[in-house]
UniProtKB/Swiss-Prot annotation:
Its cofactor is FMN. One of its GO terms (molecular function) is tRNA-dihydrouridine20b synthase activity. Keywords: Flavoprotein, FMN, Oxidoreductase, tRNA processing. Catalyzes the synthesis of dihydrouridine, a modified base found in the D-loop of most tRNAs. FMN binds at residues 33-35, 87, 158, 186, 216-218, 240-241. Its EC number is 1.3.1.90. The gene is Dus4l. This is tRNA-dihydrouridine(20a/20b) synthase [NAD(P)+]-like. It is an enzyme of class 1 (oxidoreductase). The active site is at residue 116. InterPro entries: Aldolase_TIM, DUS-like_FMN-bd, DUS_fam, tRNA_hU_synthase_CS. Belongs to the Dus family. Dus4 subfamily.
Amino acid sequence: MRSDSLPTTICQERKKDPIEMFHSGQLVKVCAPMVRYSKLAFRTLVRKYSCDLCYTPMIIAADFVRSIKARDSEFTTNQGDCPLIVQFAANDARLLSDAALLVCPYANGIDINCGCPQRWAMADGYGACLINKPELVHDMVRQVRNRVESPRFSVSIKIRIHDDLARTIDLCRKAEATGVSWITVHGRTVEERHQPVHYDAIKMIKENVSIPIVANGDIRSLKEAENVWQMTGTDGVMVARGLLANPAMFAGYEETPLKCIWDWVDISLELGTPFMCFHQHLMYMMEKITSRQEKRVFNALSSTSAVLDYLTDHYGDESLSKSL
């Protein structure tokens, strides 16, 4: 767990409280937890383009607690990385609360992943299987609440919906009674992958609880984010793939601007982002602005220097691009 010598007192006195943000009446724009992708460098980038709140990738709480190596590789932050929510996959209340205690000096809160539909996660008792285990969710939330002393430290959950929406509403009401700070709702069932998002279900959930609700699913632009926010009456929207393709979307850009690409280069070089991650993000960002032939060439590059040469040759040097 690396925090770039971030003083605990500074971390605990973060000026932007996400709970207050959700009660502001303004659209709260959230970067989703994305395995391999929503790490410090990418969070730093989207914060430059009007993202209000960022999540870490999903972290296995048991591994995080038991392994220093896991902590060092899975969680890195710095003074500018706030407000920040650390998302954990957990199936044990004690281990989750242990993990929460480790990160509470460096984050605004934790989130329990109750929505991951991947088979391995559900087989291990993580993710979306928890929407059918409200008692376990209750125990995990209560244990974190009992052990983390800071009243400003948030505990949230991210869920998918049931086929029977009444069960989801019941789950959300129970979570609210337990002390959950807010709930992010991905508007699909566990079985659904690319079907249309059930925004009507998210709206109904919002109408049946008093805590903030965040809408998630198939949001690709700021206009779509605003439409979903108004349609559902929720307090915020969470975006994953839309931000991968265009980290500047919350600032109103329809496609990734060149300045954003060069910002990513600067941030990655400064933070020492591994090449594969650095390159993969650029492939997502440049999807709409490169031809098929250009993609073949760019995607085959195998070093940071080759990528920098390509960008300079095709889009001008950094200073020129930043003036566009």
